[in-house]
Each structure stands twice: as structure tokens, then as C-alpha cells.
Amino acid sequence: MSQQETHGFQTEVKQLLHLMIHSLYSNKEIFLRELVSNAADAADKLRYLALTNDALYEGDGELRVRISADKEKGTVTIEDNGVGMTRDGVIEHLGTIAKSGTAEFFKNLSGEASKDSQLIGQFGVGFYSAFIVAKKVTVRTRAAGHKANEAVLWESEGEGSFTVDTITKASRGTEITLHLRDEEKEFADEWRLRSIITKYSDHISVPVEMWQEGTPERDGPDGEKIPATEGYWKVMNKATALWMRNKSEISDEEYQEFYKHISHDYTDALLWSHNRVEGKQEYTNLLYIPSKAPWDLWNRDRKHGLKLFVQRVFIMDDAEQFMPSYLRFVQGLIDSNDLPLNVSREILQDNHITKAMRTGITKRVLGMLEKLAKDDAEKYQQFWAEFGQVLKEGPAEDFANRERIAGLLRFASTHTGSAAPTVSLDDYLSRMKEGQTKIYYIVADSHEAAANSPHLELLRKKGIEVLLMSERIDEWLINHLTEYKEKQLHSVTRGELELGELEDAAEKEAQEKLAEESAPLVERIKAALGASVADVKVTSRLTDTPACVVTGEGEMSSQMIKLMQAAGQPVPEVKPTFEINPAHPLVSRLNDLQDEAAFADWSNLLLQQAQLSEKGSLADPSAFIKLMNQMLLANLK
């Protein structure tokens, strides 16, 4: 009795199918790469499960992928004898996209084919790529260890629905038949298929086979009889684990194709490192830095990590124990000789071998990035534009490598006059003034706010470089990166400016004299502002602006307050220190005011101006506007 059911595709699948058919038409042949990749993964999974249950092989342990074509019928079939799927598995895997953040992914699509094709490639189209060339797809599958009459038939024309039925299938594994569109019949040509397999599948460790027709008995050139040969399945790829081959034998093209196989990205990697480690631990790693950030890089639920193999046997995807979170963009694999074949995620968590390997792999990636930064600054900037903000998590997460990570960071600076983050901390150190002991920086809400901050006035006048930080993560970074190569990082908006030897004796004396002369004014402003400020001081950092606000040492900065508020965290009240510039005409005029009410209004106006300049917002903007209008009106009379 038939058990056929019709199911509707998940909404996102419909969207993906439509977009894929229209966006990936220039790279149609990737359907074969994706389907062969999936078939090879199914073989890897069976090999892993059979470690504890040999019966799953059902007497056939020679794992392989077979590809055949029928020109007359216009079909291509990809068949594997891997792990196979149950009915529930078919409905789940071939009817939905089981990825977190899928809705967000679709929001990122622009409708522009070239941009969308890049995003779709990063998303990983997998099985659905079949519909790029097929008007109908038929899947016959039986899960390893299940009875022949528990096999499943899945069919769809890629529109809105698919059918599922129960069938009988003698052999385990999955067979996918593509019924090609009329305009895609070129893919039913065996030579075309062979060229694609050679291009995309040489690195796959499972044999990929195509049928080689036999030949009849025939006469040779000298009249001798050449015996008939039987047809056979011919292996079309090298079928050895690429990472176990000698580096000198592997071409750049093979490395790039392997990257696409394991990452399901279809843009080239930026760089890679293939390394064999011998000693206390023996393992091979092949690590890739992608050229583009994945669309869901900031999604907390996103799986990341390396593929783990033990003695060439695939164990698991996304083994995040080998890679710190701030390097979560790294793709690749690790093949260990020391871990047990029955290793689990729990065992990996607290394993001394894992920890040693993680340390080694982290150093390897940092070394790759250091070499890239030294050898190819332009390419490093490309990396930084994609992954720089993630790398900034490093100093907080990885104390042991904090200095190395800091050396890889890039910032905008007053030296370049550009918003582009191209300045390293070593660049900064090389340009420090004689007698300078600190690395000066400012964190603001935008590059413009940082570059135009009044806190930079004296430093600009003296030609002292300041790093300009304006990313959300910068305040977090700077809380964990307090020094670099024995030079303290010092905020120009916090506490005293502390120029040390950069300020000569005459300047210090003049500053002290000005502060002494302005003491009565400072006291009047303190009285006028009352509890709204922590303190009032004469500034040592302003030259052209009447006043500014400064965060006290040990107090939370305005940027950190915003981060905490955005995360829904309670924030303590922080009162600023108000610094005035007595040399500015507005402040000297303020000093002459005898009307205490007007004095208080002007003092408040200067304070709120300074707060607006520092934070970009005010707690009560309406009160500020009202005060502004009142002052303007008074001066227009």
C-alpha cells in the first residue's frame, strides 16, 4: 500500500530555489561539486558510525560515489553507498533549511544577481543546487542498517512542494537523479561530466567513479585479434586525502577546490597553511582564511570550528575546541594520530591533547596573519576589512597571545588623515616623539566625532599622533589592551592628559599660573552646576574650544555605558569632570558676568554643549533647546 505524502517546502527553501536558479546561472556546474561533496560526506559519516557498529557496512565496506548519465533521457545520476536517510531524515533535510539566522540571511539579499550569488554561495546551497540545471529531481535512499522495504522515494520539481513515498531499495545509500532542463542537456554528456569531476573532485578522499564501456573483440593493425574488454566503474579522481599528500604535489587550484568542498563557499580562500606537526603530538592541519566574511559571522548560534579527523577517519564537523572564538572565521581541518577514534565533544573539552593542539593551531593562524601583514599590506587590508572586528575580541579572550594579536590590529589615526584603519601599533611606536611614553587614543561614536573631538586640540598642535577608534567593540578592546611593548595606552578623554616630557617647564608653569588665576571662576561654576558634575577644572588639553567633559580615572566611559545599555545591563550614574578653557573668549566673558542666574545658565549651556560633543546625545535634549532659545532671545533684545 502506497505511503505517498505531499509536503510544502519551508518558505526559505522556496526563496532559495528561486534566487539560486536566477543568481547562479553563470556557474551552473557547481551542482555537481555540491552533490558529490554531499555524497562524500555521507560516506565519511558511515565510516564513522561503523567504527562502533560494523554491521552497518552490510558486507560492502568499499565506499564510493558513482556518476552516470543517460543522453537520451536527459538525466544525470549521482549515487553513493554511504549512510543514507530515513523517511523523517528526508523530510527534514530535503524540505527545510536547518540553519539559525536564515531569515536574517534573506534580509541581506539585495536583488542584484552578482551580489546575491556571492551571498548564496556563502550560505551553502548544497542539495538544492540540483535545481539550477534540473526541472525535476528524484531521490531514492535507504539508511544503513534499515530493511530494504524501508527505503524512501523523494521527488520535486522545485516549485512549492515535494512528494515522499516508501519504496524497496536493495542497497543502502542515496541515489539522486536529475531530469535536466532542455537547455541544460550538455550535462548529460559523459565527457562534460568527466571534466567537471576532474576540476572539482580530485581532492575528495572517496573514489568518484564513472562507467567505462567495454569494447568488443576486434582486429588489430597486424591482423591479430584484440580480445573484448568488459565495462567497469573507473575511478576518476585521486581518491586520497588531500591533506596527507606532500605539499609540493598539490597545486593552488587543488587547495582552492578543497577549500570550497569543506566550506561550501564558492569564492576562493585568501590564504592557507598546510602543516604536519611531529613530536609530543602528531597531527596534520590544513587551515584557510576566507576572502569574504560569512553572512552570519556575528550570529551567536552559528557553528564554527574545524573538521576533525582521527587517522584519516572523519569524526565531526565544527570542532570548536581547537580554535578560539576570535578566530572563528578560520576554515579547515585537523587530522590527529593521538586522539581515540571514539572521541566525543565532551572528551575534547577537557583533554590535554586538545589543549596542546589548540595552542599550536592558534599560533599557526597568528603566524599566517603576521606574514600576510608583512608581505602584502594590501591583501592584509582586505582581510582586515572582513574580519578585523572579530580579531579585536582576541586580547580579552587570549591573554597568552595578547601582544601578538595587538600587533595585528589596525586603526585610523590623526597621522594619516583618513578614516581607513591602516595604522598598526608598531607604526605608531615608530613615529612617537622623543620623550613620549604613552600611546594616545580616543574612542567615539563615529570616525568624524573622533577626528574632530576638542580633546585632540593640544595634541594636534604639538604634532602628537592619536589613534582614532569608532567601532562598537573598541571600548571593550581597550579595556583589555592596556599596554603594548611596555607603552601604556592612554585615553585623551579620561583623567589627566599626562604629556610628561612632551610638555616643557615653561608650559607647565604657565598652566599652573592659569589654574591659580582661574580658581575663583572654577568655584563659581562648581556652585552653579552643583551635583551635575563630579568636578570642575582648568583644562590642559583645549586650545580652540571653551570647554569639554572628561571621564574620571576608573569611571565608565560614555561608549562603555552605551554598550552596557544596549545589552540591557544596569549602568551606574557617572558624573563627568567639566574642564574649562579660560583663554577662550566665551569663558573669559563668563567670568565678567555679575548676574548669577545668567552665569548659571551660561555654565549649564557650556556643559551641555560639551556633553553633546562627547556623547552625541543628551539625557534631556528638550531642556537644552529651551535653554538655547532662552539665551538667544536674551541676546537678541
UniProtKB/Swiss-Prot annotation:
Single GO MF descriptor: ATP binding
Region of interest (A), ranges: 1-345
Entries under PROSITE patterns matching the protein: HSP90
Keyword Hydrolase carried by entry: no
Name of the gene: htpG
UniProt-listed Gene3D superfamilies: 3.30.230.80, 3.40.50.11260, Heat shock protein 90, C-terminal domain, Histidine kinase-like ATPase, C-terminal domain
Subunit structure of this chain's protein: Homodimer.
Keyword Transmembrane: no
GO CC, one annotated term: cytoplasm
UniProt region (C), positions on chain: 563-637
Short name of one Pfam family: HATPase_c_3
PANTHER family hit by this protein: HEAT SHOCK PROTEIN 90 FAMILY MEMBER (PTHR11528)
Family: Belongs to the heat shock protein 90 family.
Protein's recorded name: Chaperone protein HtpG
Intracellular or extracellular location(s): Cytoplasm
Organism: Shewanella sp. (strain MR-4)
Region (B): 346-562
Function per UniProt: Molecular chaperone. Has ATPase activity.
NCBIfam families assigned: PRK05218.1
